[in-house]
């Protein structure tokens, strides 16, 4: 008796589905291309020409990130076409704070079973994020891993590389006492604090994914899947004409943990909590979860996605420019002298 022949598909990996997926995403990827991209996807590596004539002393800046448990909301809602925007945002927003223009992006998608249409929806979001950031999607990896993930769940990671002239690197070292802090409004929770948000909204409040959030007139899915704002083009615009001493991306750790990452010794940030309107979703989470204010400011962005430290004399012109770029911005505080051993961020 002959033994039954076993295929890779029998083991849970469908090569044909993978090929269909690649065909679906090729036009999405091509739409993000830049002149420096030298090859289409499908090769063993992505090719990108860093023109020697364009830069004098270029420094490459890299970043990698994921979207955490925001993915759980996408699973529950069965909506996958915007989570890729979050993935790009988390990476490119990290490198723009050092003054780097994102050049290209790569993604990693791992799933128990690859459904080409669903996978293409995910990459549609990645491509949209790349368009918003002005970077090219030059490659990626899609791993079908049967038995590794529960049900139809998946995980994602993103990788970006950008460039900045060495003498234009922003590292916070030029931040000085008297600088003003400008906060750029976030679009919502962005991609941080979702484990706490889900616990409060779904466990404590008992809301389902399609239920309307009290006082917001939006469903849980609509509110929590709002894409992370990408600030790249606005900040690049500012950098061409203004002096920016430091930039902090307000991600996990909130204002309290991220602003200190750019502060030089002897400086602290004094942030006035009354200078911007905290979005209702954060107030709801705080009230329903009985969460202390300190915990909120070290978990969520609380309405501020980026903080810029700028010379006082340039504040008004920067605010005018940001308004023209469709950014909502607030002067949220200033840089003050800090004694050794004191907190780097003072909320007043």
Curated annotation (Swiss-Prot):
Family matches, as NCBIfam families: purM (TIGR00878)
GO terms (BP aspect): 'de novo' IMP biosynthetic process; adenine biosynthetic process
GO MF term (any one): ATP binding
Location(s) in or outside the cell: Cytoplasm
InterPro entries with a match to the protein in the record: PurM-like_C_dom (IPR010918), PurM-like_C_sf (IPR036676), PurM-like_N (IPR016188), PurM-like_N_sf (IPR036921), PurM_cligase (IPR004733)
Enzyme class: ligase
TM region(s), chain numbering: none
Cellular component, GO, one term: cytosol
Pathway assigned in UniProt: Purine metabolism; IMP biosynthesis via de novo pathway; 5-amino-1-(5-phospho-D-ribosyl)imidazole from N(2)-formyl-N(1)-(5-phospho-D-ribosyl)glycinamide: step 2/2
Pfam families: AIRS, AIRS_C
Organism encoding this protein: Geotalea daltonii (strain DSM 22248 / JCM 15807 / FRC-32) (Geobacter daltonii)
Gene for this chain: purM
Family of the protein in this entry: Belongs to the AIR synthase family.
Keywords attached to this entry: ATP-binding, Cytoplasm, Ligase, Nucleotide-binding, Purine biosynthesis
Name this protein carries in UniProt: Phosphoribosylformylglycinamidine cyclo-ligase
Reactions accelerated catalytically: 2-formamido-N(1)-(5-O-phospho-beta-D-ribosyl)acetamidine + ATP = 5-amino-1-(5-phospho-beta-D-ribosyl)imidazole + ADP + phosphate + H(+)
Source superkingdom: Bacteria
Documented EC number(s): 6.3.3.1
């Amino acid at each position: 008796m002959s033994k039954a022949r076993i295929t890779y598909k029998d083991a849970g990996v469908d090569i044909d589905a993978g090929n269909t997926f690649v065909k679906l995403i090729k036009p999405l990827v091509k739409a993000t291309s830049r002149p420096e991209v030298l090859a289409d996807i499908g090769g063993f590596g992505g090719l990108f020409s860093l023109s020697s004539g364009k830069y004098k002393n270029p420094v490459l800046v890299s970043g990698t990130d994921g979207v955490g448990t925001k993915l759980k909301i996408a699973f529950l809602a069965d909506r996958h076409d915007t989570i890729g925007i979050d993935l790009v945002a988390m990476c490119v927003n990290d490198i723009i704070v050092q003054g780097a223009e994102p050049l290209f992006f790569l993604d990693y998608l791992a799933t128990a079973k690859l459904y080409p249409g669903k996978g293409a929806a995910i990459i549609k979001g990645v491509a949209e994020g790349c368009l918003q950031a002005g970077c090219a999607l030059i490659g990626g990896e899609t791993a079908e891993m049967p038995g590794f993930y529960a049900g139809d769940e998946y995980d994602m990671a993103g990788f970006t590389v950008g460039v900045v002239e060495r003498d234009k690197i922003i590292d916070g070292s030029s931040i000085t006492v008297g600088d003003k802090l400008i906060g750029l409004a976030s679009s919502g929770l962005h991609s941080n604090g979702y484990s706490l948000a889900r616990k409060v909204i779904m466990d404590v409040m008992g809301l389902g994914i399609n239920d309307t959030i009290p006082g917001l007139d939006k469903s849980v899915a609509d509110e929590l899947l709002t894409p992370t704002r990408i600030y790249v083009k606005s900040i690049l615009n500012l950098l061409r004409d203004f002096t920016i001493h430091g930039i902090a991306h307000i991600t996990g750790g909130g204002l309290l943990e991220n602003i200190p990452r750019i502060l030089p010794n002897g400086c602290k940030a004094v942030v006035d909590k009354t200078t911007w309107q905290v979005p209702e979703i954060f107030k709801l989470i705080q009230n329903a979860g009985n969460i202390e204010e300190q915990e909120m400011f070290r978990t969520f962005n609380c309405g501020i996605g980026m903080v810029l430290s700028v010379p006082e004399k340039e504040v008004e012109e920067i605010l005018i420019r940001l308004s023209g770029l469709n950014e909502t911005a607030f002067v949220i505080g200033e840089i003050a002298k800090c004694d050794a051993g004191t907190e780097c961020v003072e909320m007043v």
